[in-house]
């Protein structure tokens, strides 16, 4: 570690080591939330914080089973109508009662096109108030994933939003701010008391929460720390209690540190490269008059040039699983028999490029975040070097995740690295978000590479309403194989995500990378 990095680490550790009560959880990771608006950005770190303050009608248990939350019961009135009985006596953090009006309002808000959370109400046509403690969801068709999706349909106070003129979802991609992007009004187990972007979020336990946590955490302090050495130094010095972004080079050392422990676990997140497949010409390339990535042979060449095993061995130090599929183990639809990527083959890649009309390669740009995924910028550096061996001269543009994602949502990236976690643990979520042709609704709502494949579209549309499990899983399998074989994106690997913490911290590792303070105990 350089003197400059060591000094920065010591300074941050000293600031974090201010006296904390025994029931304060000091948690750090490399990436900050994007917003406090629960309907704006489908971003795992943001959702991990938001789930402490906002709640859905249902939630996941410690074992990812759907269980009651703001709804106590649901009944399938018909194939396209589900009645939810709401929990009585629940109050928002300002003391106002939770009612059906808040559910109806939040549904209208999350569906607004400037947000990216509409995927969680996919298939829902309307939410109708029956009475103050009952709502009906009217579906477009039978929706097998309804309950698993509704975990992330966060309910906001209607009266609070109206009072503060924040009934519209924040337009994050255009850098808009609204009252809800900086303030919170939910019913959850914790109140967000302060947020200083890129510095700190503080949360305090909600004494009026309707449920009782299994843990004893009364306060949460979340600190985004981009620098790997600084983040690790904060844990070693006692400045933080838990890290959920471990630098791969430090995992072995931290295992041997007295007073610390490693909580091992995989993550349902796949790291991949997306290419602009829909523009007439691709910006950032020296190919004019056509889309260089539209030729499948070019996509195959770019994929074959990447040595995933080398990235796993060196950059990731074993903390990844090389991938051919766009979903990870633990996601419904994953099949290890389909997930073995072809070995890197530069000679074959060069031949494919020559056959496609690029015997000397071409120039392009690769956009990459540098504070979001494990070793994200280093992975992009690896890929750029591997592409250079086949004559593809890629310029790397790496930046903080906030401007990266804003540019991505404005279709400014010709090729980019992204990681995709599966919040509902079902491959439809991935296929519908990333590969389905983009519409004004949930379909393709994260398809910023302009992928459009009629076969995948047909399969996704069918699986959204298919209630026969075997038939639906066959559709998922076919769509995943089609995505793989047509190289609609280039999967690199599935992340392995151990967490490190002090010995006195007990919590549950979450494959969705969303720690929950309600499951955490500090002794």
Protein language model regions, located:
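N-terminal lobe/hinge region of extracytoplasmic solute-binding protein
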Residues: 28-77, 108, 183-189
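Alpha-helical secondary-structure segments
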Residues: 100-106, 132-138, 188-189, 217-219, ...
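Long beta-strand-rich cores associated with HINT superfamily self-processing modules
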Residues: 443, 499-523
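Structural transition elements
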Residues: 304, 321-355, 372-376
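Surface-exposed binding/hinge segments that line
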Residues: 75, 119-168
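Extracytoplasmic/peripheral linker and loop segments enriched in polar/acidic and small residues
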Residues: 297-300, 304, 312, 389-404, ...
């Amino acid at each position: 570690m350089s003197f400059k990095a060591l000094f920065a680490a010591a300074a941050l550790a000293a600031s974090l080591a201010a006296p904390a009560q025994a029931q304060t959880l000091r948690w750090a990771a490399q990436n900050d939330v994007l917003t406090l608006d629960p309907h704006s950005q489908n971003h795992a770190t943001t959702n991990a914080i938001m789930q402490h303050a906002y709640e859905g009608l249902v939630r996941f248990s410690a074992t990812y089973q759907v269980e009651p939350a703001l709804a106590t019961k649901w009944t399938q009135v018909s194939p396209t109508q589900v009645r939810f009985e709401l929990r009585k006596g629940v109050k928002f953090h300002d003391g106002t009662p939770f009612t059906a009006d808040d559910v109806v309002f939040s549904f209208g808000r999350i569906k607004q096109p400037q947000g990216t959370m509409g995927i969680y109400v996919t298939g829902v046509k309307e939410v109708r108030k029956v009475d103050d403690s009952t709502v009906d969801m009217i579906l477009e068709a039978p929706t097998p994933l309804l309950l698993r999706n509704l975990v992330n349909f966060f309910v906001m106070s209607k009266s609070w939003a109206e009072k503060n003129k924040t009934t519209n979802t924040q337009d994050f991609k255009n850098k808009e701010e609204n009252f809800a992007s900086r303030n919170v009004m939910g019913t959850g187990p914790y109140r967000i008391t302060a947020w200083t972007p890129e510095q700190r979020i503080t949360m305090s336990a909600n004494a009026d929460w309707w449920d009782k946590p299994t843990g004893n955490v009364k306060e949460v302090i979340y600190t985004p720390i981009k620098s790997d050495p600084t983040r690790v130094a904060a844990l070693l010095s006692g400045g933080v209690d838990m890290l959920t972004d471990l630098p791969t080079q430090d995992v072995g050392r931290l295992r041997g540190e007295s007073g610390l422990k490693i909580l091992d676990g995989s993550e349902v997140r796949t790291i991949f490269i997306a290419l602009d497949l829909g523009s007439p010409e691709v910006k950032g390339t020296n190919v004019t008059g056509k889309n260089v990535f539209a030729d499948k042979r070019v996509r195959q060449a770019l994929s074959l040039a990447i040595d995933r095993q080398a990235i796993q061995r060196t950059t990731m130090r074993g903390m990844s699983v090389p991938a051919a599929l766009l979903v990870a183990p633990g996601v419904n639809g994953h099949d290890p028999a389909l997930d073995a990527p072809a070995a890197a083959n530069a000679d074959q890649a060069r031949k494919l490029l020559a056959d496609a009309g690029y015997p000397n390669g071409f120039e392009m740009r690769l956009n990459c975040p540098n504070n979001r995924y494990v070793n994200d910028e280093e992975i992009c550096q690896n890929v750029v070097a591997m592409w250079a061996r086949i004559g593809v001269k890629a310029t790397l543009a790496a930046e903080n995740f906030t401007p990266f994602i804003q540019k991505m949502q404005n279709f400014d990236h010709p090729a980019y690295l992204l990681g995709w976690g599966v919040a509902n643990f079902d491959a439809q979520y991935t296929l519908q978000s990333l590969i389905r042709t983009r519409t004004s609704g949930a379909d393709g709502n994260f398809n910023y590479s302009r992928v459009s494949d009629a076969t995948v579209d047909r399969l996704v549309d069918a699986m959204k309403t298919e209630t026969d499990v075997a038939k639906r899983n066959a559709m998922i399998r076919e769509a995943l194989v089609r995505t793989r074989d047509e190289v609609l994106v280039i999967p690199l690997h599935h992340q392995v995500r151990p967490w490190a913490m002090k010995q006195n911290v007990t919590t549950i590792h979450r494959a969705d990378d969303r720690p929950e303070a309600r499951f955490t105990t500090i002794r």
